[in-house]
Amino acid sequence: MGPPNAPPRRAFGWRPGQNARTWRPHREPSRGAGFDAAMTLRRAAAKAFTGGALLRAGVGVLALAYAPAARAQEGCARAPPLGAPAGAPADPLVGTGRVTFVNERLELALADGRLLRIAGLDPPRPTPGDPDLDVNSSVKLADWLVGEDVAFRLLETRPDRGGRLAAEAFAPVGDPASPARPLAQAALEAGLARFEPGEGARNCRAALLAAEAGARAAALGLWADPYYAVIAAGDHDGFAEKAGTSVIVEGRVIDVERSAYRTTLIFGPRRGWDFSVTILQRNTKIFGAAGVDLESFKGRMIRVRGLLDMRFGPQVEVSGPDEIEAITQAKDDAGPATAPRR
């Protein structure tokens, strides 16, 4: 139970002038200013990329990871120190706070008035099959956290336009006597959200993807809803009514096309009908800085996440390697790839 002043659970996520319950992802949204603004934000996020390394693991597995991996995962697994040595200035980015409520975006409202957005989480939306999916996820997280203290490490000094501060957050989960653990990882393990790539989640990327994969395999939380199933690149019906929403698509790249303006990963022979992934020219440099050769994706199975654009056939624009998982190293026994028809 939360403190006496906590709002009703059905009010999670409400802000003046906003009604989160009116949004329904199964209705195709306008492809106007809203969609363009979302794409602009994703492109801007690419500028924060600082580089990394392409690591091959085994004969049949390729993973995109960022060095130094061991150090990064240690940083992901530990809560930040909650104090400074005597005489040393306190770190303004590190702190602790009491959670008073959790909204439907899985953001944590603290007793001091701050609102934390947990880095690495893409919270669920209402779906045709479960209009309360977002509420149920927030209630579960609230059961863990409301009335409890969380440790956090802020990833930015100023809140965004929604008043949120991106942060890594840590707290005991389930048993208050248990050690504090990363809340993003715990939420993904329970299927309360999907992994969201970004600078703030980069150090924890491998651990967070593994947590998401476990929940997906066990059909926990949102993964029990068919709406959130990973879409096969060749399943055109799977893209229906999802334009402008965040999707995860998996398939084999049959060709890589380069032009003066973009590089396109092609998944099928019918241009304008089959799925494709677009990387704008300015973002190809980000892949190069990470040691990722886009041509190397040809013939490989990859998993891509991003906003779905249906204006010229199903496609997703990615801004950096964080948004792609390469899950095989080369072609399997399915036979040679088919070149696209022009």
Predicted regions and their residues:
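Bacterial N-terminal signal peptides that target proteins for export
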Residues: T40-G58
